[in-house]
Amino acid sequence: MSAPRTLYDKIWDDHVVDQQEDGTCLLYIDRHLVHEVTSPQAFEGLHMAGRPVRHPEKTLAVVDHNVPTSPDRINGIQNEESRIQVEALARNAADFGVEYYSERDKRQGIVHIVGPEQGFTLPGMTIVCGDSHTSTHGAFGALAHGIGTSEVEHVLATQTLIQKKAKNMLVRVDGKLPAGVTAKDIVLAIIGEIGTAGGTGYVIEYAGEAIRSLSMEGRMTICNMSIEGGARAGLIAPDETTFEYIKGRPRAPQGETLEQAINYWKTLHSDEGAHFDKIVTLDAGSLPPIVSWGSSPEDVVSVTGVVPNPDDIADETKRASKWRALDYMGLKPGTKITDIAVDRVFIGSCTNGRIEDLRAAAKVVEGKKVAPTVNAMIVPGSGLVKEQAEAEGLHKIFIEAGFDWREPGCSMCLAMNDDRLKPGERCASTSNRNFEGRQGFKGRTHLVSPAMAAAAAIAGHFVDIRAWK
């Protein structure tokens, strides 16, 4: 009888083509997502070697990082480098027979939102993309992670990847989430607990009552930020919530094939007694809405808390880095989080740009107005999310409140397009990274949930969403 295995063990074992004595494996890749930033050199390598894309039907190309989100984006991209990358992806996709969603296609959007909504992402698969937040797809019980440009070329040419197996980590979130606390708060709390290096060398499986109660959108938010916790990937075992989400998607199995697939997917869970190298537990019932205060995703505190004092940190190097973060953020220890005013609000990204996120934000702002000191924007994660939101009338709620209603793309998550912070501007953002300069040169980022960001836009400062009227 074989030893109990984790979910990660099972998917890994199913995809090993060959294994060397030192543990290096050749892993088969089921799905490859491609965007314009990390693919040009990879496709150029194929051109120079005269190689085809081995499995174009298992590859999907989407433009997302560089595209403008302004309503007039059809007029073209002003930045020359960005325009060249977008044009190169369109040309390469055509040359190699890869399906491509341009900015003119309503299916276009952020690659990690597009994959799941098209049914391209399925349980038990290995999925890669030249983007660190590929971990998002792990919400379906898939082994998904980012790869470098040279690896992008390798997967395009061979449909395989050279890898060494990571260790197993279990993060169990027990109990029920209080009102006003979301998946974003869970994952920020996890990163605050383990630190940005806590998951280094591991693949994380998320489990527990609070995780099971989440929608697929919430689960994608959790897995999306696994990389911010240092992990290679994040996984959640598929269940009925997963299967219902997949049914009817354009590229998902149909009919009897779907039923056969579901029977297999039901085996994708960690066996009782399976070994985890590290286990972390959190009590969902005690979690508050969370706000980041520094320049690392581990710098988090309750919305009812205060900016911490780095002098309380024993480690000299870490203490110095936190003082630097406070200096960059323009904050002082002891400042109440609810006293921090914001200049900008960004609701979107592959972390929180889905329909559920927009519904949560709309519920907060309906009938209210954005503070006169705040510039706020909503960027749907895909054309289909935008279409659904408009069908529900959410765009009218946002526009009447004073938000900018934009076209889909990565937008202000990163300063690679026209949406960026000016030096010194402070932003409540639903994205995943608050590094120095991430949203614009000398811009200051606070990571929050969509509801918290929406409330900050109305109030002009952070507020406890649990007390929102």
From Swiss-Prot:
Gene3D superfamilies: Aconitase, domain 3. InterPro entries: 3-IsopropMal_deHydase_lsu (IPR004430), Acnase/IPM_dHydase_lsu_aba_1/3 (IPR015931), Acoase/IPM_deHydtase_lsu_aba (IPR001030), Aconitase_4Fe-4S_BS (IPR018136), Aconitase_4Fe-4S_dom (IPR036008), IPM_dehydratase_rel_enz (IPR050067), IPMI_cat (IPR033941). Keywords: 4Fe-4S, Amino-acid biosynthesis, Branched-chain amino acid biosynthesis, Iron, Iron-sulfur, Leucine biosynthesis, Lyase, Metal-binding. It comes from the Bacteria. Belongs to the aconitase/IPM isomerase family. LeuC type 1 subfamily. Heterodimer of LeuC and LeuD. Its EC number is 4.2.1.33. The keyword 4Fe-4S applies. Pathway: Amino-acid biosynthesis; L-leucine biosynthesis; L-leucine from 3-methyl-2-oxobutanoate: step 2/4. This is 3-isopropylmalate dehydratase large subunit. Its cofactor is [4Fe-4S] cluster. GO terms for molecular function: 3-isopropylmalate dehydratase activity; 4 iron, 4 sulfur cluster binding; metal ion binding. It is an enzyme of class 4 (lyase). Catalyzes the isomerization between 2-isopropylmalate and 3-isopropylmalate, via the formation of 2-isopropylmaleate. Binds 1 [4Fe-4S] cluster per subunit. [4Fe-4S] cluster binds at C350, C410, C413. It catalyses: (2R,3S)-3-isopropylmalate = (2S)-2-isopropylmalate. One of its GO terms (biological process) is L-leucine biosynthetic process. SUPFAM superfamilies: Aconitase iron-sulfur domain. It comes from Brucella melitensis biotype 2 (strain ATCC 23457).
